[in-house]
Amino acid sequence: MRVLLIIAGLALLSVVCYTSEMKEQNSLNEVLSAFFDVEEPPEKGCIICF
């Protein structure tokens, strides 16, 4: 019975760590995308765009 409880606790801990890691990665991606959106110069209406 204790072994089953330990396994369930470890599974719950791994799920919590995984979700917090995904949230952290998503927030980092949002910060980076916001930073690069600000840094890009606005496109000008050019005839020949490469």
UniProtKB/Swiss-Prot annotation:
Record's keyword annotation contains Nucleotide-binding: no
Superkingdom assignment: Eukaryota
Tissue expression per record: Expressed by the venom gland.
Position of the signal peptide: 1-19
Primary location class: secreted
Recorded GO CC terms: extracellular region
Gene Ontology MF terms: toxin activity
Localization of this protein: Secreted
Keyword hit for Secreted: yes
Record's keyword terms, sorted: Secreted, Signal, Toxin
S-S bonds: none
Similarity field: Belongs to the neurotoxin 10 (Hwtx-1) family. 67 (Jztx-67) subfamily.
Name of the featured protein: U37-theraphotoxin-Cg1b
Organism: Chilobrachys guangxiensis
